[in-house]
Structures are given as C-alpha cells and as structure tokens.
C-alpha cells in the first residue's frame, strides 16, 4: 500500500446554477512533503467545514484503482489525481478491505479511518453534471475519510502500513451499502 499523490486545493468561487459557490474540491498534486495535522493537510482548504474537513474528516483518501473505470465511464482519459477532491490518492486500499477504525501509518503521520465519503453537490459542480452525485454513490467507489491520530508529514511514494484493526468493525463498503 502506498501514497501515489498528495493533493491540495484552495477555495474557489465558481458559478453553478445561477449563483457563485465556494468550494475547495479542486485539488492538484503537490510536490515534496506536506504536513498533516489534526484538521488536515497544510495548504489545503475547505469552504464548508460543516460538511467537509474538521477532525473526523481531516484527510480524504481515494483508491487509484478506481480511476480507470471513471476515465472510461466519464469519457475523460486525462482525469488526474485529486479529481474527486481527495487529499491522498492511494494504491492498495479499497473500500471492501478497509474497516472503520483502521489505524494506518501514512508517511510519518498516523490516521484512523472514520467514514466513507458521501457525495455532495460540489462533486456535481466540479464535473458540471448534477447526476454525478448519483453516479458516484451508485458506483460504491466512495473513498474514505480519516482523523489524524499523530501529526506528521506525507509525500507521494510513501508506504502505508496497517497498524491496527478491529476485525468486527464494518468495512467502508459495508457502510456505503447501508447508506446508498
């Protein structure tokens, strides 16, 4: 398991459905090491902290394994890392294998998986299609949020290590299936 890309974004104001909407969903790959703290990654911004960010959603991880299917389904062969607003594009961490409560070492930081990402209107706005929210949920390719148990730093190429798991805890996919 490893980090393929660390992605950061600044808040933008974007016209959507007749009004200006603020969002930090547009993420770009960062270079070098990035500090990870209790409220997220240094240099990353969220416009609506009631829905995104905060201690329980400090870091959003998304499997790179989902990108080929999205590129084909959306007709976007150049879809790049961070496209879904994730902070960490990761390899080897799938919703069917990751459990709520899993503790992971990512770079020098430690995170605890808290919940799946449930899509919001900002995802539809980013892709210019409100139906994207429904497509994302139906795909069950949600990615997942984590809280930060130990501050540290992370960079592309860092190994991800499972430090602890409660095997009785549901997988991220189990939770998505219950909510979908």
Where are these regions (language model features)?
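Electropositive, beta-rich accessory/interaction domains or terminal extensions
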Residues: 1-122, 131, 166-180
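A generic structural motif
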Residues: 88, 144-147
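Loop/turn positions that initiate beta-strands
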Residues: 101, 151, 155-157
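Short beta-strand-turn/beta-hairpin segments enriched in glycine/proline and small hydrophobics
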Residues: 126-138
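A structural signal for small-residue-enriched, beta-sheet-centric alpha/beta enzyme cores
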Residues: 141-145, 158
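Basic (Lys/Arg-enriched) interaction patch that binds polyanionic ligands
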Residues: 156-165
């Amino acid at each position: 398991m490893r980090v393929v890309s660390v992605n950061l974004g600044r808040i933008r104001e974007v016209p959507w459905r007749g009004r200006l909407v603020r969002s930090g969903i547009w993420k770009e790959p960062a270079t070098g090491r990035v500090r990870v703290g209790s409220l997220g990654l240094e240099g990353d911004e969220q416009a609506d902290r009631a829905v995104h960010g905060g201690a329980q959603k400090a870091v959003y991880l998304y499997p790179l394994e989902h990108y080929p299917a999205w590129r084909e389904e959306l007709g976007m062969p150049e879809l790049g890392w961070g496209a879904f607003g994730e902070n960490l594009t990761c390899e080897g961490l799938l919703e069917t294998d990751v459990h709520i409560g899993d503790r992971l070492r990512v770079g020098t930081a430690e995170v605890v998986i808290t919940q799946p990402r449930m899509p919001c209107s900002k995802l539809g706005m980013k892709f210019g299609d409100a139906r994207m929210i429904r497509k994302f949920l139906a795909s069950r390719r949600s990615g997942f949020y984590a809280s930060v148990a130990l501050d540290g730093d992370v960079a592309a190429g860092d190994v991800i290590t499972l430090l602890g798991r409660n095997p009785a805890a549901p997988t991220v996919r189990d939770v998505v299936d219950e909510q979908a």
